[in-house]
């Protein structure tokens, strides 16, 4: 996990807590196919699990706690709903298969004795289960989180200092104490009374992971979170604030579907892979070229910062607000969109809206001019926030502090979800075999792909700037490969290799390392898609991991993306290297 990123600005104040944890000498485990940077820093004990099988391991750990009498039934009885139904799954009453450590060992690649020892070690000590946001981007990704909460409940430490579980420590100062002050908002995202020019057909809002499927199948109906959604017939795409040609699985399939609409418009500050697939590009200013305002720390809310314009807009770029105000004007609803405010007037309003809540926090925020001239305002951190324990109030009195669940308790079994009768997400957490992974290895595609976030990027942002060279090999995205897998393929560090799946192929630069388990490769997510014709066919020559991944929903419940799932093969590249051109400005059609 990393903590160097945020939706807004950040003080990186959580890093101090990680340093303190290391200094204290607290034992940590890294249960991951990859020995990541956090594990390296903490010198964690590595439990190298097969990709997508963590859920089976946790089920087996709960089984071990239950059959040895160590599951905390006092906690389960008082604070959870559905243990009886989940236990039936655990003991094989549903499918005839007991979820024993031996069962999980065959799936996960972890020895049964290791699973047993891990379960007892977690029970014997005050244990915090910490996860990032990559694990849900696998097939059946919802199950991991549900099973993790179930494991935490069986351990019985939820609501105790240093115990329980947490899900957002990897970014935005997650885990840092919450400061005493209002969160700074933004321009409202819902503008009334704007309505479609023509009667709308299909769902008005789609989850972003549906984009390819929706473009391919207009009018199709899909199950989603207990409801039905109908894909509209997209005639035009207007994309801002994202780079689907980096973040969406099976990029070559997306490329084909992207051609179906009549017109594609992209607003961005750089020539991303997505901008290169647009008919019209509206060049937006960078943060240096216009004024803005931001909270400091998404999770910690440390204060407010004035983002002063440093230089005038370069070339033909304009601020996003100017671009959309002008479009609204052309469409006849400028007043409804702008509410009669300039960009600077919106910034002042946003600040004053927050300042208007000062009394709630018993603080006195400066007037806007004082704030803007100084450039920032920091909130104090109360001692109570430094001592905050997640779910402590719930543990103290679950009836007075009900959770936002069906029962008000920790929902181990959900009658609501069970009522959907989905075959890929039942009423409780359970293990499903991923569509691709270690267990699905074939002679043609024997390796499992992992695609974690890149160390030098935020998703695909910053791949185009000079610091990309800090990690590239021959201008290609690195691929981590275990020495055993590299030796059998006569690959050494520094070689350019071809990585191929059933869906596509890409070039990458080999890094031979023990930090990835045998049978698994790692290509960090976020390289820019750069397809070229080569003697080996049309391939991505820069190394976008999603050129390889499978595009299917996690399940009918969340329909999330599975951008870290795929079977691949790696071979040494012996042909002439095609140049990487995705960072070179394309020629414009005038």
Predicted regions and their residues:
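Long, contiguous, secondary-structure-rich segments that constitute the structural scaffold
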Residues: 310, 320-371, 460, 466-480, ...
């Amino acid at each position: 996990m990393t903590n160097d990123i945020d939706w807004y600005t950040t003080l990186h104040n959580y890093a101090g807590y990680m340093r303190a944890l290391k200094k204290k000498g607290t034992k940590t485990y890294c249960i991951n196919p990859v020995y990541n940077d956090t594990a390296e820093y903490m010198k964690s004990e590595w439990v190298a699990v097969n990709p997508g099988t963590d859920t089976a391991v946790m089920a087996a750990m709960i089984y071990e706690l239950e059959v040895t009498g160590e599951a905390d039934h006092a906690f389960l009885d008082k604070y959870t709903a559905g243990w009886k139904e989940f236990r039936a799954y655990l003991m094989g009453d549903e499918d005839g298969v007991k979820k024993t450590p031996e069962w999980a060992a065959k799936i996960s690649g972890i020895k049964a004795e290791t699973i047993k020892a891990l379960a007892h070690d977690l029970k014997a000590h005050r244990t915090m289960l910490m996860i990032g946001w990559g694990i849900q981007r696998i097939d059946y990704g919802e199950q991991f989180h549900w099973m993790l909460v179930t494991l935490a409940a069986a351990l019985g430490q939820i609501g105790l200092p240093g115990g329980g579980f947490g899900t957002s420590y990897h970014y935005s100062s997650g885990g840092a104490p919450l400061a005493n002050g209002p969160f700074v908002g933004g321009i409202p995202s819902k503008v009334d009374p704007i309505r479609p020019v023509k009667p709308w057909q299909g769902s008005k809002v789609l989850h972003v992971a549906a984009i390819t499927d929706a473009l391919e199948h207009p009018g199709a109906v899909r199950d989603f979170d207990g409801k039905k959604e109908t894909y509209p017939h997209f005639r035009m795409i207007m994309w801002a604030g994202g780079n689907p040609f980096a973040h969406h699985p099976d990029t070559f399939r997306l490329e084909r579907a992207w051609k179906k609409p009549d017109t594609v418009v992209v607003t961005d500050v750089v020539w991303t892979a997505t901008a290169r697939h647009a008919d019209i590009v509206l060049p937006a200013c960078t943060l240096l070229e216009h004024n803005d305002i931001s909270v400091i720390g998404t999770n910690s809310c440390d204060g407010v910062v004035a983002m002063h314009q440093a230089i005038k807009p370069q070339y033909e770029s304009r601020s996003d607000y100017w671009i959309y105000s002008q479009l609204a004007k052309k469409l006849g609803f400028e007043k409804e969109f702008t509410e009669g405010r300039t960009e600077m007037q919106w910034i002042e309003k946003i600040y004053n809206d927050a300042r208007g809540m000062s009394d709630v926090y018993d603080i006195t925020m400066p007037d806007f001019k004082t704030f803007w001239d100084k450039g920032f305002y920091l909130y104090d951190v109360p001692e109570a926030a430094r001592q905050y324990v997640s779910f402590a109030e719930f543990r103290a009195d679950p009836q007075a502090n009900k959770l936002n669940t069906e029962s008000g308790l920790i929902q181990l079994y959900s009658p609501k979800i069970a009522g959907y009768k989905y075959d890929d997400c039942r009423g409780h957490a359970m293990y499903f075999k991923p569509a691709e992974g270690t267990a699905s290895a074939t002679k043609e595609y024997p390796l499992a792909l992992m695609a974690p976030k890149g160390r030098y990027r935020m998703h695909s942002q910053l791949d185009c700037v000079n610091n990309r060279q800090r990690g590239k090999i021959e201008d290609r995205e690195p691929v981590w490969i275990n020495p055993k897998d590299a030796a059998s393929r006569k690959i050494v560090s520094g070689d350019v290799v071809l990585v191929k799946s059933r869906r596509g192929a890409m070039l990458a630069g080999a890094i031979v390392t023990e930090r990835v388990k045998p049978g698994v490769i790692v290509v960090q997510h976020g390289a820019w898609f750069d397809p070229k014709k080569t003697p080996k066919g049309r391939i991505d020559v820069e190394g976008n991991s999603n050129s390889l991944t499978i595009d299917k929903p996690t399940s009918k419940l969340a329909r999330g993306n599975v951008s870290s799932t795929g079977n691949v093969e790696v071979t040494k590249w012996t042909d002439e290297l095609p140049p990487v051109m995705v960072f070179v400005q394309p020629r414009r059609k005038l």
